[in-house]
A protein has these predicted regions:
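Acyltransferase/transacylase module recognition
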Residues: 87-183
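Alpha/beta catalytic cores of group-transfer enzymes, especially the acyltransferase/condensing modules
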Residues: 1-122
Length: 183
């Protein structure tokens, strides 16, 4: 308790980083050019949010999560997953694995295992990942439940395809779009 995430909207990464100086907060998500999510203790995030609003951020809400995801505060549990993956045999994937923390496709099983295990302790580069998927001509993004935030963020990131939330659109719409795009 006492930890989580705060979204800073309306400021760039460099502006948010400058506001974080002297606090124990971390960049958690790079969702869009001017939507940066920070992680940390509630008081520290509140201070950064206050500074952000004073510098012209349009919003700086504390998100409804109690985990400081995608930052070094979760390095220890991530390391536990690294150790678990060391006991699993992985093969090269048949389909491209797009990393949210690098925004790049990974093919090597050991790099994919590291990415999956360490994801909770690394910054998510959502916008870069969406751009990378777009460059590879992916044309359908389906957000799994719950929610629809990623669907909206995908549309904002120069996405040229369809983007839907299963929560909001349902499986029938997803199947229809997949079939239409395959034809």
């Amino acid at each position: 308790h006492g930890y989580g995430l705060t979204a800073i909207m309306g400021l760039t990464l460099s502006q948010v980083e400058a506001l974080m100086v002297g606090t124990k907060t971390w960049i958690a998500n790079l969702n869009a050019e001017t939507q940066i999510v920070i992680a940390g203790a509630d008081e520290e995030m509140a201070e950064v949010a206050k500074r952000a609003l004073a510098k012209g951020a349009s919003k700086a809400p504390r998100l409804a999560v109690s985990v400081p995801s995608h930052c070094e505060l979760l390095a220890k549990p991530a390391q536990t997953l690294v150790e678990a993956f060391s006991r699993v045999t992985l093969s090269r994937p048949r389909y491209a694995y797009l990393s949210g923390s690098t925004g790049r496709v990974l093919w090597q099983p050991e790099r994919i295992a590291d990415d999956l295990a360490m994801n909770m302790a690394r910054t998510v580069r959502w916008q870069e990942a969406v751009i990378s998927a777009n460059e590879r001509e992916a044309r359908l993004a389906i957000e799994m439940p719950p929610g629809g935030v990623l669907t909206c963020l995908t549309r904002q990131a120069a996405w040229e395809g369809e983007s839907i939330s299963l929560d909001r659109s349902g499986i029938d719409v997803a199947v229809h779009l997949a079939q239409r795009l395959r034809a």
